[in-house]
Amino acid sequence: MSQEPEPGAMPYSPADDPSPLDLSLGSTSRRKKRKSHDIPNSPSKHPFPDGLSEEEKQKLERRRKRNRDAARRRRRKQTDYVDKLHEACEELQRANEHLRKEIRDLRTECTSLRVQLACHEPVCPMAVPLTVTLGLLTTPHDPVPEPPICTPPPPSPDEPNAPHCSGSQPPICTPPPPDTEELCAQLCSTPPPPISTPHIIYAPGPSPLQPPICTPAPPDAEELCAQLCSTPPPPICTPHSLFCPPQPPSPEGIFPALCPVTEPCTPPSPGTVYAQLCPVGQVPLFTPSPPHPAPEPERLYARLTEDPEQDSLYSGQIYTQFPSDTQSTVWWFPGDGRP
């Protein structure tokens, strides 16, 4: 016995599924719309047809209830799925808005950096010329020419805190001329001239390209000069013991205060150092030569003439006689005002 569906029954159909318009609506409106369907044991809107027995009416009621429960479960699942999609869409919209804001900030920063780059390119010392770029494209095997090294100009004394390179003007390239480099190389490779005089060490004159070279004296000469200068000077009438032997005392014991001998007994030889002429605390820059053997020393004589009538000195005679010379030097000292 085939059973036909009752006209009052509401079987499940695809029309019960939410439409795209319902999916676009909020979850609140959808929940309000389905409240009437979610009420359990709600009375049927369609009455039973006439001519049915009680058993058939119970079967029809059970079928309607199953259909309503199945439709309710289906709508609930679909609603939960749509709610999840709606929450994911809202989260994606928030992330999209955040990304759009970040993109706007990056575009603003990119525009600012492009403006700074356009202002810096004309004065940048590291910029590669266009000819070098074209040469690299045409001849890839040639070596890359290095850009010139720019030396910023030194700051003037009026502006000690002035920067070397300003943003408005490029640095000035000042390579040294080739003639100056060659001249400096020749001057540096040339050895210093030999020292011909043992007395004074001469240094070359000042040059605009090379500072004067100061050659220190040998350490032995410095030590010897320091020792000679530290020695106290001898008396005026006695020459230095290094160059003249000690003089024998005068037999008459003439006046030491009137002795006119203030110079050494022998003429100075080249390189001779006299302690009398060396000031204390100053070391001369020359090398002394060894003392020469002195010849036989000259002799100093004195002769006094006294007046037999008076006990006073009438005249005195002091003379010096050299062994190799017969001439002598005589000094007269009159006494008592007599002619």
Swiss-Prot record:
Basic residues composition-biased segments: 60-77
Q: Which Pfam families match?
A: bZIP_1
Keyword Coiled coil, does the record have it? Answer: no
Compartment(s) where it occurs, according to its Swiss-Prot or TrEMBL record: Host nucleus, Host nucleolus
Region entry Transactivation domain: which residue ranges? 120-339
Name the Gene3D superfamilies on file. Answer: 1.20.5.170
Question: Which keywords describe this protein according to UniProt?
Answer: DNA-binding, G1/S host cell cycle checkpoint dysregulation by virus, Host nucleus, Host-virus interaction, Modulation of host cell apoptosis by virus, Modulation of host cell cycle by virus, Phosphoprotein, Transcription, Transcription regulation
Leucine-zipper: where is this region? 85-113
Gene Ontology CC entries for this record:
host cell nucleolus; host cell nucleus
Region named Disordered: 1-80, 145-172
What are its GO biological-process terms? Answer: negative regulation of viral transcription; positive regulation of DNA-templated transcription initiation; regulation by virus of viral protein levels in host cell; symbiont-mediated perturbation of host cell cycle G1/S transition checkpoint; symbiont-mediated perturbation of host transcription; symbiont-mediated suppression of host apoptosis
Q: Which residues carry the post-translational modification Phosphoserine, per the record?
A: S42
InterPro entries noted in UniProt: AP-1, bZIP, bZIP_sf
Motif Nuclear localization signal at which residues? Answer: 62-78
Any one GO MF term held by the record is: DNA-binding transcription factor activity, RNA polymerase II-specific
Name the domain of life this protein comes from: Viruses
Note down the stretches annotated as region Basic motif.
57-84
Quaternary structure? Homodimer. Interacts with host JUN; this interaction allows MEQ to engage in host cell processes by disguising itself as a cellular JUN.
Q: What is the role of this chain?
A: Functions as a DNA-binding transcription factor. Promotes transformation, host cell growth, host cell-cycle progression through G1/S phase, and possesses antiapoptotic activity. Forms functional heterodimers with host JUN. These heterodimers bind with high affinity DNA sequences called MEQ-responsive elements MERE I (TGACA/GTCA), while MEQ homodimers bind a second type of sites termed MERE II (ACACA). Both homo and heterodimerization of MEQ are required for oncogenesis.
Q: Give the family per the record.
A: Belongs to the bZIP family. Jun subfamily.
Name under which the protein is recorded: Oncoprotein MEQ
Query: What is the name of the gene encoding this protein?
Result: MDV005
